[in-house]
């Protein structure tokens, strides 16, 4: 190779390659088949539902941050910081592929030993239903235990919980919006059968919604 040709080769190898724009780089790594999964719609509820089912955790036990699902993106976003000094007594989330009258997935409070990071999912067993009215609208909560926690997995009904535990849950939901001047009413806890019925109803409502969407 001549000296002139060698110098040209060196110059071309040292010249910086054009860097594609960010959106071009992102699009080049994605296809229509590799869109990020949506935790509400893409995660299955589980073969044992409505008895045992998957739960996507939104809020960690002991947190003052009110996280919630962003229904458009599927990401977990910060909704607000609680106005009072209370913290969530247990992990809180939703059941995938369910739908309630407020157009949200069904809410669940999961009792277990440890806090779980927002965005993770776990298997839970329904043990009861907490009927609740939030600012005049129905906003019932499923009370569940982690099906893979050795301390809680044997619970099958809410009557097996200590009265103090039930009072702790009730008081949290009665008080956590008081400083926002928002009224919440909690009715008597209902047994596991009522929880199973509520979950099944929300599963059916979600299925109807999907069929209606496909027919459009």
UniProtKB/Swiss-Prot annotation:
Alphabetized, the UniProt keywords read: Cytoplasm, Hydrolase, Magnesium, Metal-binding
Compositionally biased region (Acidic residues) = 1-10
The answer, when asked if Transport is one of the entry's keywords, is no
Residues recorded as binding Mg(2+) 2, renumbered to this chain, are 107
Q: Which GO terms describe its biological process?
A: phosphate-containing compound metabolic process
GO cellular component, alphabetical, reads: cytosol; nucleoplasm
Top enzyme class, one word, equals hydrolase
Source organism per entry reads Arabidopsis thaliana (Mouse-ear cress)
Name of the protein in its database record: Soluble inorganic pyrophosphatase 3
Q: Which Gene3D superfamilies match?
A: Inorganic pyrophosphatase
């Amino acid at each position: 190779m001549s000296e002139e040709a060698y110098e040209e080769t060196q110059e071309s190898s040292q010249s910086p390659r054009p860097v594609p724009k960010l959106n071009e780089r992102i699009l080049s790594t994605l296809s229509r088949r590799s869109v990020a999964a949506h935790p509400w719609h893409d995660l299955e509820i589980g073969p044992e539902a409505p008895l045992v089912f998957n739960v996507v955790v939104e809020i960690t036990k002991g947190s003052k941050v009110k996280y919630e699902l962003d229904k458009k993106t599927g990401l977990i976003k910060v909704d607000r910081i609680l106005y009072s000094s209370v913290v969530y007594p247990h992990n809180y989330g939703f059941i995938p592929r369910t739908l309630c009258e407020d157009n949200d997935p069904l809410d669940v409070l999961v009792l277990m030993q440890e806090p779980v990071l927002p965005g993770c999912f776990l298997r839970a067993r329904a043990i009861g239903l907490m009927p609740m009215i939030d600012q005049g609208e129905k906003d019932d909560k499923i009370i569940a235990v982690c099906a893979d926690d050795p301390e809680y997995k044997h619970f099958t009904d809410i009557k097996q919980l200590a009265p103090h535990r039930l009072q702790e849950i009730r008081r949290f939901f009665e008080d956590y919006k008081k400083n926002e001047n928002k009224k919440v009413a909690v009715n008597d806890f209902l047994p596991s059968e009522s929880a199973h019925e509520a979950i099944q109803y929300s599963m059916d409502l979600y299925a109807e919604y999907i069929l209606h969407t496909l027919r459009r």
